[in-house]
């Protein structure tokens, strides 16, 4: 679609089909390669249902984010939504925790990449399973951060290359797995789906991991859905480019369900093929790329792992570029010190990059590089946004402010879906076993506890102090709206 003209040139905005493709590419990442083993172990033969539930929830929250973008035109960030609805007091916390969450997400991705790389490059060594602070795995992690910094020095061109590389890698790996897997299933009449029962064990349901209520399929499905949701992360960013889209009010609410449905269909096909090839092998595998464990042919298995590795590398490059910019955006708006936004001669915000990289390394170290716990943390950390943004949308829909007067209200997307998102988000959040974050081998994990307190309490508190100190210095009063 051609938009308005600027200096004689037509501005081409993203049409409906482009928005759908953007959504699909934003969601499909490393998650589908990494999560099947844990999901099968938690849900057994009901593992596909966990991905269906995760997809439905992702679709609901994505539509909530897209609807909020109708009221806030500046950008699609959760920081902007909550600031517009509740003022800086709430917006600052959401903005800071969003930056922290992005840093954690990058750390999880980097941990997965390093583990996979060590397994592929050194299959005879146990380096990929190391839990110690000082290990080959930690050194490789630091080296990988250095490589990502070097790539960042090349600027946007390198990021475009990384996105293209990631897309090619994941498309090739998934296509090869599905086509090759179906060929094996049909020609050799393979059906190992029922072996999922041997991998399944009912998980106790406990509120916050403390008060145990019962043990059964429901509790297992709740935890499996949280893990499966990691494969859908990225859906919350679909609406970020709303200003670049043609008629986002009309196209986003239609495009997002199609994108989620398409991704869900791909995931279900991939998971079904994997479970038919060998559910028990996937669940029992110690490899990072769980899907490959179902394949008996070594060459075919290597192709899938390398494709996933290429995909993870590209995603890490993009994360290393985007996550530090969240800190610089907060610094530019006065929430954080301006030195966080200072860039070197290569246009890299070194202070923000250092903060992001430190958090990216700290959390995997605190959780001993445990893939299941890292996946859960990456999802749970996002629930701050998943709960507050729907509340912000309800407030924006009720607002009588002039800037929101022209927005056409819709009771279903403005009230019903946000309420559903809030209820489900709270339900999943309280279902998570937080002991895996705060405890290690039965005792307190002081490293992890200190990190959580510093990142989610101390850092936001410092941001508030800095912001209000700046306000007092200029002699203005902060908005409480």
From Swiss-Prot:
Keywords: Cell membrane, Membrane, Transmembrane, Transmembrane helix, Transport. The keyword Membrane applies. It comes from the Bacteria. The lineage of its organism: Bacteria, Bacillati, Actinomycetota, Actinomycetes, Mycobacteriales. This is Uncharacterized transporter MT2031. The keyword Transmembrane helix applies. PANTHER family: AMINO ACID TRANSPORTER-RELATED (PTHR42770), ARGININE_AGMATINE ANTIPORTER (PTHR42770:SF18). Pfam families: AA_permease_2. Belongs to the amino acid-polyamine-organocation (APC) superfamily. The chain crosses the membrane at residues 14-34, 46-66, 90-110, 134-154, 167-187, 218-238, 258-278, 303-323, 377-397, 411-431, 446-466. It is a multi-pass membrane protein. It is found in: Cell membrane. Its main location: membrane. GO terms for cellular component: plasma membrane. Probable amino-acid or metabolite transport protein. GO terms for molecular function: transmembrane transporter activity.
């Amino acid at each position: 679609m051609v938009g308005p003209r600027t200096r004689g040139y037509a501005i081409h905005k993203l049409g409906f089909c482009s928005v759908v493709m953007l959504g699909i590419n934003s969601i499909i990442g490393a998650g589908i390669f990494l999560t099947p083993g844990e999901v099968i172990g938690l849900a057994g033969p009901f593992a596909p249902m966990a991905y269906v539930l995760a997809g439905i929830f992702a679709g609901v929250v994505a539509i909530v984010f897209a609807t909020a973008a109708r009221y806030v035109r500046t950008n699609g960030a959760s920081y902007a939504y909550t600031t517009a609805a509740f003022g800086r007091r709430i917006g600052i916390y959401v903005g800071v925790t969003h930056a922290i969450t992005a840093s954690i997400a990058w750390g999880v991705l980097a941990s997965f990449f390093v583990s996979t790389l060590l397994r592929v490059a050194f299959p005879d060594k146990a380096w990929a399973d190391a839990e110690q602070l000082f290990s080959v795995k930690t050194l490789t992690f630091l080296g990988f951060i250095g490589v990502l910094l070097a790539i960042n020095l090349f600027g946007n061109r390198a990021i475009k290359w990384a996105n293209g590389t990631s897309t090619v890698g994941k498309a090739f790996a998934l296509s090869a797995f599905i086509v090759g897997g179906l060929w094996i299933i049909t020609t050799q009449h393979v059906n190992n789906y029922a072996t999922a029962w041997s991998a399944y064990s009912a998980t106790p349901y406990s509120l916050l991991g403390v008060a145990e209520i019962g043990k059964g399929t429901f509790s297992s499905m709740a935890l499996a859905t949280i893990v499966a949701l990691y494969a859908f992360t990225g859906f919350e960013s679909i609406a970020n480019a709303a200003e670049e889209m043609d008629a986002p009010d009309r196209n986003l609410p239609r495009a997002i369900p199609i994108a989620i449905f398409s991704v869900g269909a791909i995931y279900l096909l991939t998971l079904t093929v994997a479970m038919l090839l060998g559910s028990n092998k996937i669940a029992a595998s110690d490899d990072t790329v769980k899907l490959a464990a179902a394949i008996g042919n070594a060459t075919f298995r290597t192709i899938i792992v390398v494709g996933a590795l290429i995909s993870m590398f590209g995603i890490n490059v993009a994360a290393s570029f985007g996550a530090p910019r969240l800190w610089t955006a907060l610094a530019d708006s006065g929430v954080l010190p301006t030195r966080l936004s200072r860039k070197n001669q290569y246009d890299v915000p070194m202070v923000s990059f250092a903060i992001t990289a430190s958090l990216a390394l700290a959390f995997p170290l605190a959780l001993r590089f445990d893939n299941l716990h890292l996946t859960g943390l990456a999802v749970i950390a996002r629930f701050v946004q998943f709960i507050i943004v729907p509340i912000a949308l309800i407030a924006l829909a009720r607002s009588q402010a002039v800037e929101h007067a022209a927005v056409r209200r819709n009771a279903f997307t403005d009230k019903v879906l946000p309420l559903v998102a809030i209820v489900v988000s709270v339900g999943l959040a309280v279902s998570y076993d937080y002991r895996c974050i705060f405890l290690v081998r039965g005792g307190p994990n002081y490293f992890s506890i200190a990190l959580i307190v510093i990142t989610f309490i101390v850092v936001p508190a410092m941001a508030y102090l800095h912001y209000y100190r700046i306000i007092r210095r200029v002699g203005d009063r902060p908005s409480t709206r």
